[in-house]
From Swiss-Prot:
The keyword Kinase does not apply. PANTHER family: PEPTIDYL-PROLYL CIS-TRANS ISOMERASE D, PERIPLASMIC CHAPERONE PPID. The gene is ppiD. The lineage of its organism: Bacteria, Pseudomonadati, Pseudomonadota, Gammaproteobacteria, Pasteurellales. GO terms for cellular component: plasma membrane. Residues 267-357 form the PpiC domain. This is Periplasmic chaperone PpiD. It is a single-pass type II membrane protein. The chain crosses the membrane at residues 16-36. GO terms for molecular function: peptidyl-prolyl cis-trans isomerase activity. Belongs to the PpiD chaperone family. It is found in: Cell inner membrane. InterPro entries: PPIase_dom_sf (IPR046357), PPIase_PpiC (IPR000297), PPIase_PpiC_CS (IPR023058), PpiD_chaperone (IPR052029), Trigger_fact/SurA_dom_sf (IPR027304). Residues 1-15 are cytoplasmic.
Length: 620
């Protein structure tokens, strides 16, 4: 999580969010937390992480995975096993973050409001004509739906965890002798020539008698199993199957508009300015100066403790309802344009508020929103009808459990039939974890009964499926005739490999003895240990071979294709420390990850983590 937070703080996306400074800095300084008290999801050393925080983190992670995996993510999330793992990963992430937060507190690490303000004021995102633009920053905050305290906590946490990350980075080091040894081994080069004996070519030259095939069959009969197979009837039902049946009348649209006019308005905005003061006495002095005619902007610039808005004469820009604390907005709403309030206490500061201008709510005309309302009503009616029909189909599947014909008739769709298949080769239409579980883990495959309604869609595209096993073929041992062709290939492969290995071993013996032998080696090539993943079988042999002295060393092995290979090791060149720099940064990052994981493991071992099991169970 620290690495991820560290990456986020250096990404463009995070810098945009980071620049959306919390209005709590304007009003009260650093915010106090993401959310208020709520039913807990988990308690970490007595500190509550509520269900709202869990759901927010879950939604954020869903968005990330949806962007990476698309529809496949929602299909995975529909499976109980994956959903359980996903929810646990979200919970673990929140617990880890809280442990790090508490660890930072124990270390007396902290981020001041001035540190965050400095970052924001100097951010290019909110610079206009080379200066910080308060209205631009306020506008971006509103557009992103961020609350003051919520964003303050995010910024504070991000900078705090970055401090810990910096500590981990600075505590991780390696001595030159270690780097020299790693360079020598990881970047070691081995110059080889290879002689390849293709297995496929030799297999084509082999024969296998019926007696040999029968002998293999008798010895390996229990391994020659035909897995259970099914032929499945199924019905798939989606909202689009009944979309053409949904009609929306003009009367419905007009009625909806009248009942929901409040939803079809351009929300009003208020242009505000304020002077923030540390105590009541100072606030009264400034209020009196205003009554005597002193300019509001000048007083804000000279006396306001909110340094950001003070530079703008107290200007907070245009704001919508819900941005400021309730008492602040109530006071502003009671003012006329150009009217100034008496000092009002908001948290630990006093504010004198001025309304510079106001834009009232503007109702959107019916014709402008008509198409939108039609879609809203159509979608609601469609989902309602889809739900009703799905329920009716489920009842019919239960009442007449030996056929799907009437189930399909209710929805106006067809019963489809699969080809014969086993669990390793699921047809695309049935390749869903819920369907596979219903077919293979229960009694359906032998009972011939209809399944329950299976929800195989996702939040954006609902889909219901019913399945029934029409034909069931149990697992059985294949007959000799059925397995004969496969056995023939196996026997021929074994013969070919034995022959090639014997030939290669004989040639290696001759080469080691210095005798002339006809081996067709290819041109020399250089293999580097750090790239062993390219051909692990070959590399394992090459880098385990004895180093050559005055002549090459030889050994028999295989390549990834199964061919038999003679390796001639010509030369070994150790890696140099100066070439190690690119790898060093990767290894350093890995070491830091391991250090962070060890730290979390230690913190968890000493922590009290109380999970709300009832809440977690409800998520399944």
């Amino acid at each position: 999580m620290i690495e991820k937070m560290h990456e986020r703080t250096n990404s463009v996306a995070f810098k945009v969010i980071f620049a959306l400074v919390s209005l709590s800095f304007v009003l009260t300084g650093i915010g106090t937390g993401l959310v208020g008290a709520d039913t807990s999801a988990v308690k970490v050393n007595g500190t509550t992480i509520d269900q709202h925080a869990f759901n927010t983190a879950k939604a954020r992670q869903q968005n990330v995975l949806n962007a990476q995996l698309g529809e496949r993510f929602w299909d995975l999330l529909d499976t109980p096993e994956y959903a359980k793992q996903f929810n646990q990963s979200v919970l673990d992430g929140l617990v880890n973050d809280e442990l790090m937060r508490q660890y930072a507190k124990d270390l007396k690490l902290g981020i001041s409001a001035n540190q965050i303000k400095s970052q924001i004021v100097n951010s290019q995102i909110f610079q206009q004509d080379g200066k910080f633009n308060n209205e631009l920053y306020q506008h971006t905050l509103r557009n992103n739906g961020l609350t003051a305290d919520g964003y303050a906590a995010i910024v504070n946490e991000g900078m705090l965890l970055s401090q810990i990350q910096k500590g981990i980075v600075e505590s991780d080091f390696s001595v030159p002798v270690t780097e020299a040894l790693l360079a020598k081994l990881l970047l070691q080069q081995r110059q080889v020539r290879l002689a390849t004996y293709p297995i496929a070519k030799e297999i084509a030259n082999q024969t296998a008698s019926v007696e040999e095939l029968q002998k293999y069959y008798d010895a390996k009969k229990t391994d020659l199993v035909e897995p259970e197979q099914l032929v499945v009837e199924y019905v798939t039902f989606m909202p689009k199957d009944i979309e053409k049946n949904i009609q929306v009348t003009d009367e419905q649209v007009a009625t909806y508009y009248e009942k929901n006019k409040a939803d079809f308005v351009t929300k009003g905005e208020t242009h505000l300015a304020h002077i923030q003061l540390a105590n009541e006495e100072k606030a009264k002095q400034v209020a009196e100066a205003l009554k005597q005619g002193t300019d509001f902007a000048m007083l804000a610039n000279d006396t306001s403790t909110d340094s950001l808005s003070a530079q703008q004469g107290g200007d907070l820009g245009w704001t919508k309802a819900g941005i400021f604390p309730e008492i602040f907005e109530q006071t502003a709403n009671a003012l006329a344009i150009n009217e100034v309030s008496e000092p009002v206490k908001v948290d630990n500061n006093y504010h004198i508020i001025k309304v510079l201008d106001r834009k009232e709510d503007v109702a959107l005309p019916f014709e402008m929103v008509k198409d939108k309302i039609v879609k809203i009503i159509r979608d609601e009616l469609l989902l309602t009808e889809y739900s009703n029909i799905s329920h009716e189909m489920a009842n019919k599947a239960f009442e007449n459990s030996s056929s799907l014909a009437e189930v399909a008739q209710i929805a106006g769709v067809n019963v489809q039939t699969s080809t014969q298949f086993n669990r390793e080769h699921i047809p695309a239409d049935l390749n869903n974890e819920k369907v596979i579980k219903a077919l293979f883990n229960g009694e359906l495959r032998q009972s011939g009964q209809n399944s329950d309604a299976l929800d195989v869609g996702n939040e954006r595209e609902p889909k219901t499926m019913f399945v029934r096993v029409r034909d069931f073929y149990p697992e059985r041992v294949r007959t000799f005739d059925e397995a004969k062709a496969d056995i023939e290939q196996i026997v021929k492969h074994q013969k070919a490999e034995q022959l090639l290995l014997a030939k290669a071993e004989e040639n290696v013996k001759a080469l080691n003895e210095g005798n002339a032998v006809n081996v067709d080696f290819n041109e020399a090539e250089t293999l580097v240990y750090a790239k062993r993943a390219d051909n692990p079988i070959l590399f394992k042999t090459v880098f385990a071979m004895q180093k050559p002295t005055d002549k090459p060393t030889y050994q028999v092995t295989h390549n990834q294709q199964g061919d038999v290979v003679i390796v001639s090791l010509e030369k070994v060149i150790d890696g140099k420390q100066e070439e190690f720099a690119p790898l060093a940064s990767q290894l350093k990052q890995l070491d830091q990850t391991l250090l962070r994981n060890d730290l979390l493991k230690d913190l968890r071992s000493r922590a009290s983590v109380d999970v709300n099991q009832n809440f977690i169970e409800q998520l399944k």
